[in-house]
């Protein structure tokens, strides 16, 4: 009988979320410096009538926590979200790094998801119009917004920025976005068409004919041509729009430094400046022998296609996919270069072993071109091995190229699918959510016969009907600052439980 009493005294009952768990006190002492290892009957959550400790926490996670005390192994429940699991472990005083290796990959998936969502937030893919408070915070005049002292420029600056940088914010912004895309397409089309022979005009040169009378003449030089004058006017109109767009976006940008160092904006600067540089240098082109070299700078304007990323979320995701796959792409290039050098050297010496009057591989640098074309499975056919040993090397080169390129591709595709799926799910998620107020501590019950507003602890003003000054609830309640901020016209749903 004494053994039974001793066993019952060593047992402890834990009621977590309405589910009762029973274990030994010695089990809870296995992991010191935790919440369960310091249980005493003096705690507020101890019920002397039921002889149990009550915790209003997640019961499913606590089952794994209690098993950790019993077995010394912490496993991750698959039906619980990662942040909730971390929050519960923090409440019980446990380290999340003690999760077993078998559950570690599943447990850390939420961290990858959080990083992905953070990246998507930086990409600015939202099509929903932000609130006035969010705009004030973004443009740095939040204090003036709360004080109600917003100037005319502070009010117009977000609107101008939305018109030129957020194409889906309003109908006017969509119109400006269409105009911007139109000028980009016209500029690229003009850049391509002006190189067509039918779109070029032969150069007319004046020469001096030395005759007895001394007359001047001219002739038509068909070997050298210039683009039609219409393309010059088209480029002037397009670059005038691009210059206006850059200036307006820079003036109205919320962060000037972030705007300057943006990769898309840098491309826009270079492409626009190249037009003006070309315009200045054309004045001196007639004095240069190779004036065509100046036209090389105009190739920078083709990079304006990257400006379309502002108007397409798919292009933003694609570029972010390549950024996230930088390690895999670097590894791919490394193995390609390694294979190209190896097989170029092998095919050079393989073709020299046997007599071959039609040897195309006169040097290893020529073999580098052949190895690159073969490993990428392009195969132009301009160079090909003629000997059996060279053919064997070519077969190995093609096989190695297929394996080298095919291995990193699934990783890149997986990254794109991950970003795209998160973007689609994020688009369906409502941006404005119902705010949940923090749960207040329950008030102590009022003792029988005690005056109104005096609780069992003898504290005035804590009764169920107490007013702001401890009276019987006759005066109006005072709203604290936190509740006052929540109950505002801008919040979707907020209640006060004072």
From Swiss-Prot:
The transmembrane segments are 175-193, 230-252, 263-284, 292-313, 329-350, 392-413
The family database entries (SMART domains) matched by this protein are listed as: BTB
- Region: Disordered; residue ranges are 431-498
Predominantly, its location class is: membrane
Q: Which residues are glycosylated?
A: 206, 213, 481
For biological process, the GO terms are: action potential; potassium ion transmembrane transport; potassium ion transport; protein homooligomerization; sleep
Q: List the disulfide bonds.
A: none
**Short motif Selectivity filter, span:** 377-382
* Membrane association type: Multi-pass membrane protein
Which proteins does it associate with, and in what oligomeric form? Heterotetramer of potassium channel proteins.
List the PANTHER family: POTASSIUM VOLTAGE-GATED CHANNEL PROTEIN SHAW, VOLTAGE-GATED POTASSIUM CHANNEL
Q: Which family does it belong to?
A: Belongs to the potassium channel family. C (Shaw) (TC 1.A.1.2) subfamily. Shaw sub-subfamily.
Q: What more is known? A: The segment S4 is probably the voltage-sensor and is characterized by a series of positively charged amino acids at every third position.
What is this protein's record name?
A: Potassium voltage-gated channel protein Shaw
Which gene is annotated as encoding this protein in its UniProt record?
Shaw
């Amino acid at each position: 009988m004494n053994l039974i009493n001793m066993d019952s005294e060593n047992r402890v009952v834990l009621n977590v979320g309405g589910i009762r768990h029973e274990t030994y006190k010695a089990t809870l002492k296995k992991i010191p410096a935790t919440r369960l290892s310091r249980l005493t009957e003096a705690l507020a959550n101890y019920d002397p009538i039921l002889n149990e400790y009550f915790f209003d926490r997640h019961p499913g996670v606590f089952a794994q926590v209690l098993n950790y005390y019993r077995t010394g192994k912490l496993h991750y429940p698959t039906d619980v979200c990662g942040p909730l699991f971390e929050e519960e472990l923090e409440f019980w005083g446990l380290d999340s790094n003690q999760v077993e290796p078998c559950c570690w990959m599943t447990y850390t998936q939420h961290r990858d998801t959080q990083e992905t969502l953070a990246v998507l937030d930086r990409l600015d893919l939202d099509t929903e119009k932000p609130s006035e408070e969010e705009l004030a915070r973004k443009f740095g005049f939040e204090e003036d917004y709360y004080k109600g002292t917003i100037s005319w420029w502070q009010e117009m600056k977000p609107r101008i920025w939305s018109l030129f940088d957020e194409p889906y914010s309003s109908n006017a912004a969509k119109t400006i976005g269409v105009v911007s895309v139109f000028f980009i397409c016209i500029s690229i089309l003009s850049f391509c068409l002006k190189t067509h022979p039918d779109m070029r005009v032969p150069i007319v040169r004046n020469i001096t004919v030395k005759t007895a009378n001394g007359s001047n003449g001219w002739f038509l030089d068909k070997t050298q041509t210039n683009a039609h004058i219409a393309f010059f006017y088209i480029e002037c109109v397009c670059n005038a729009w691009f210059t206006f767009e850059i200036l307006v976006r820079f003036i109205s940008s919320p962060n000037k430094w972030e705007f300057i160092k943006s990769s898309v904006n840098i491309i826009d600067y270079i492409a626009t400046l190249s037009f003006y540089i070309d315009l200045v240098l054309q004045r001196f082109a007639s004095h240069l022998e190779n004036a065509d070299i100046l036209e090389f700078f105009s190739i920078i304007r083709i990079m304006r296609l990257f400006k379309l990323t502002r108007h397409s979320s798919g292009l933003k995701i694609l570029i972010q996919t390549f950024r996230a796959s930088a390690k895999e792409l670097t590894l791919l290039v490394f193995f390609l270069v390694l294979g190209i050098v190896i097989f170029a050297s092998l095919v050079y010496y393989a073709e020299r072993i046997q007599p071959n009057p039609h040897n195309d591989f006169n040097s290893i640098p020529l073999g580098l071109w052949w190895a690159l074309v073969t490993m990428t499975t392009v195969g132009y056919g301009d160079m090909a091995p003629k000997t059996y040993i060279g053919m064997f090397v070519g077969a190995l080169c093609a096989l190695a190229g297929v394996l080298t390129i095919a291995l990193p591709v699934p990783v890149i595709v997986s990254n794109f699918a991950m970003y795209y799926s998160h973007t689609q799910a994020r688009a369906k998620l409502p941006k404005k959510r119902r705010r949940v107020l923090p749960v207040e501590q329950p008030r102590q019950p009022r003792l029988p016969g005690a005056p109104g507003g005096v609780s069992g602890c003898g504290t005035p003003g804590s009764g169920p009907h107490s007013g702001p000054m401890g009276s019987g609830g006759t005066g109006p309640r005072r709203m604290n600052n936190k509740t006052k901020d929540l109950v505002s016209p801008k919040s979707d749903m907020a209640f006060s439980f004072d």
